[in-house]
Each structure stands twice: as C-alpha cells, then as structure tokens.
Swiss-Prot record:
Function per UniProt: Specifically catalyzes the AdoMet-dependent 2'-O-ribose methylation of cytidine at position 56 in tRNAs.
Pfam families documented for this protein: Trm56
GO cellular component: cytoplasm
Protein name (record): tRNA (cytidine(56)-2'-O)-methyltransferase
Major localisation: cytoplasm
PANTHER family with a match to the protein in the record: TRNA (CYTIDINE(56)-2'-O)-METHYLTRANSFERASE
Length: 183
C-alpha cells in the first residue's frame, strides 16, 4: 500500500498546538499519521520548528513520502479542502462511534482531512466536518484516537506500506531489537 491508500490523499490537521506544552504529543500525532498511512501533517497556527524538524528527521531516516506544513489557518485549510472535493473527518468524543461510520467513510473515494484537536475545538470544525467521529466517549489521547481511526480507515493495510527513501527498517524479532540499514 502507498500512503493515502485508495483515497489518494489523507492528511491530518492538528488544531490548537501550544508550543510550550504540546511538543511531544503533537510530534506523536504527526508520527502516528505517517506510520498509519497518511500522506502528510498540517500544524495549524504557530509554526513549531522543533516539531517540524523532528518529523522531518524521522522521514529522512525511515522513509516517506510524508509532507509537513505549519503556520496555516485551520479554518481556511478546511474550507480549501472541502472546495477541492475532499471530505473532513473530525475526531472527537462527541461524534458517532468509529466502528459504526468507519466502513462508510472508507467506502468513499474522496480525499480525507482528519482533524485532531489539542484544546477546546471551535464549533466551526464540528459544523464543517462531513463526519464527527468518536473513538470512545471517555477522555483520552488524541494520539490513540488518530491511530484507531486510521487503522479502521485503512482496514489494517497500513502495516504493508513501503516507505521508500529511508535508510532504516525494523526487522521482526521475537526477542531483542533488530534494525536493518537499507541499501
């Protein structure tokens, strides 16, 4: 499988990043997006170079393609995405259960923008989303929500993505750590 799978493009938009507080979690959102099949990561608002560089280093070592953008207006990005024919999936604990809607979302061939909040998400995103998807109805991590949603969207096929361009690859091992250098 190539990143984006049958949809061509799947991007993750991270809202409300607070540089002094969210570096690690936001970096993990981006890394989960990459590992679970998205084509890219978009950081709304402030451009946190620490997060951007961290993700780019992972892509250089482990392969891509995976794009990173930052400093965009989340509202404008969502509107642009919809105007371009894509659909918007907002992950929230107040939406429809992921297991009930993931097959319907996966059946649509349209490009996907997955919106993940950090702090209180504005009403705009609930209203503009084609889908408000709940991964559980209890407070938990946006990293977990994204991983579960992308797993359902790609039906587990993200495990077979071929990451070209990197020079490291983990080899399966019952015990210990095995990392192979490519090329």
């Amino acid at each position: 499988m190539k990143p984006g799978g049958p949809y061509g493009d799947v991007y993750v938009l991270r809202l409300g990043h607070r540089p002094e507080r969210d570096k690690r979690v936001t970096t993990h959102v981006a890394l989960v997006a990459r590992a679970f099949g998205a084509n890219g990561f978009v950081l709304e608002g402030v451009c946190d170079e620490g997060v951007v560089e961290s993700v780019r280093r992972v892509v250089a070592r482990w392969g891509g393609p995976f794009t990173v953008e930052c400093g965009v207006s989340g509202r404008r990005y969502v509107r642009m995405w919809r105007e371009g024919g894509g659909e918007v999936v907002h992950l929230t604990m107040y939406g429809v259960n992921v297991d009930d809607v993931a097959p319907v979302i996966a059946a649509s061939p349209r490009r996907k923008l997955v919106v993940v909040g950090a702090e209180k998400v504005e009403r705009f995103y609930y209203e503009e989303a084609d889908w408000n998807v709940s991964v559980g109805t209890q407070p938990h991590s946006e990293v977990a929500a994204l991983a579960l949603f992308l797993d359902r969207l790609f039906r587990g096929e993200w495990r077979f993505i071929d990451y070209s361009g990197g020079f490291l690859r983990v080899m399966e091992s019952q015990r210990g750590k095995r990392v192979e250098r490519k090329g």
